[in-house]
Curated annotation (Swiss-Prot):
SS bonds (residue pairs): C41-C64, C45-C60
Key words of the record: Chaperone, Disulfide bond, Metal-binding, Mitochondrion, Protein transport, Translocation, Transport, Zinc
GO annotation, biological process: protein transport
Its biological purpose: Mitochondrial intermembrane chaperone that participates in the import and insertion of some multi-pass transmembrane proteins into the mitochondrial inner membrane. Also required for the transfer of beta-barrel precursors from the TOM complex to the sorting and assembly machinery (SAM complex) of the outer membrane. Acts as a chaperone-like protein that protects the hydrophobic precursors from aggregation and guide them through the mitochondrial intermembrane space.
Oligomeric and partner information: Heterohexamer; composed of 3 copies of TIM8 and 3 copies of TIM13, named soluble 70 kDa complex. Associates with the TIM22 complex, whose core is composed of TIM22.
Protein name per its UniProtKB record: Mitochondrial import inner membrane translocase subunit Tim13
Assigned GO CC terms: mitochondrial intermembrane space
Motif mapping: Twin CX3C motif: 41-64
Recorded GO MF terms: metal ion binding
UniProt similarity note: Belongs to the small Tim family.
Coiled-coil boundaries: none
Length: 84
């Protein structure tokens, strides 16, 4: 039985199904975002990988991630405000 089937055989609750899909999409988006940001910031900030990050590498990664999060927020707000 898949996660969209109900045990009683009746059709699934549409609202509950939509909530489940939204939650799965949000989780997938967050995972993809973190992977992308992590890879880009690591590539930008860590020029000589070693056994640990230097202070400047750690600061660079932190600033880079903060900028990505801020930029994503700006773009999201712009998209949502233009659709209204």
């Amino acid at each position: 039985m898949d996660s969209f089937s109900s045990s009683s055989g009746s059709p699934p609750n549409t609202e509950a199904l939509m909530d489940q899909i939204k939650a799965q999409l949000a989780q997938a988006y967050a995972q993809e975002f973190l992977e992308t940001v992590g890879n880009k910031c690591f590539a930008k900030c860590v020029t000589k990988p070693g056994s640990s990050l230097s202070g400047s590498e750690s600061s660079c990664i932190s600033r880079c991630v903060d900028r990505y999060i801020e930029a994503t927020g700006i773009v999201s707000r712009a998209l949502f405000s233009s659709t209204r």
